[in-house]
């Protein structure tokens, strides 16, 4: 399941766990870049979302699963697992993927506690797999402009910042 250096010319095969809004952003990339990324499986509790992804990528029933615990008993062969579950559900599927030898691309936060984060890191090191964390907004023009303003001190020397978002 590990990617070898001589495999660089083929697409990276992935299974996505959690097929909500964030996952669909990554899947847009996979759809327009099939030479780089190939979706080979979807794990999603919600039937409608799971079926929508399956239809969009031509996945059959053997490539779809309603829960990750069942999936990891007989996983679809792939290079990596993309974990896009809700924030409080990152640890267990990450550990299961690592134990099975998959590389993991994980939405932030890595886990809910420092101990869980350390456990993921240790398990990945022991198994020889890569765990990468998505920080995609750091390259969004909005945030790049903020970084530029801070770096140039155009607005003065920044001493403190606070942010709040309406989740509605």
Where are these regions (language model features)?
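Aromatic/hydrophobic pocket-lining residues that form π-stacking "cages" and hydrophobic walls in ligand
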Residues: 50, 93, 120, 146, ...
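Beta-loop-alpha module in the N-terminal Rossmann-like domain of NAD(P)-dependent dehydrogenases
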Residues: 62-123
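Single conserved hydrophobic/aromatic residue that forms the stacking wall/gate
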Residues: 160-168
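Oxidoreductase and adenylate-handling cofactor-binding alpha/beta cores
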Residues: 139-159
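N-terminal Rossmann-like dinucleotide-binding module
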Residues: 1-58
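Short strand-turn motif at the edge of the Rossmann-like AdoMet-binding core
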Residues: 108-109, 135-137
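Rossmann-fold dehydrogenase core element
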Residues: 119-136
């Amino acid at each position: 399941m590990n990617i070898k250096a001589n495999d660089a010319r083929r697409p990276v095969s992935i299974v996505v766990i959690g097929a909500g809004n964030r996952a669909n952003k990554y899947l847009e990339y996979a759809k327009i870049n099939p030479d780089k990324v190939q979706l080979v499986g979807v794990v999603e509790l919600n039937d409608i979302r799971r079926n929508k992804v399956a239809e969009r990528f031509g996945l059959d029933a053997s490539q779809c699963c309603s829960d990750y615990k069942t999936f990891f008993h007989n996983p679809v062969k792939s290079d990596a697992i993309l974990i896009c579950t809700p924030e409080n559900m990152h640890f267990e599927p990450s550990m299961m993927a690592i134990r099975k030898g998959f590389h993991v691309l994980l939405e932030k936060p890595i886990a809910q506690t420092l101990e869980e984060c350390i456990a993921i890191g240790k398990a990945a090191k022991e198994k020889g797999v890569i765990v990468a964390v998505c920080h995609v907004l750091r390259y969004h023009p909005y945030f790049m402009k903020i970084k530029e303003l801070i770096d140039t001190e155009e607005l003065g020397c920044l001493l403190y910042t606070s942010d709040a978002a309406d989740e509605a």
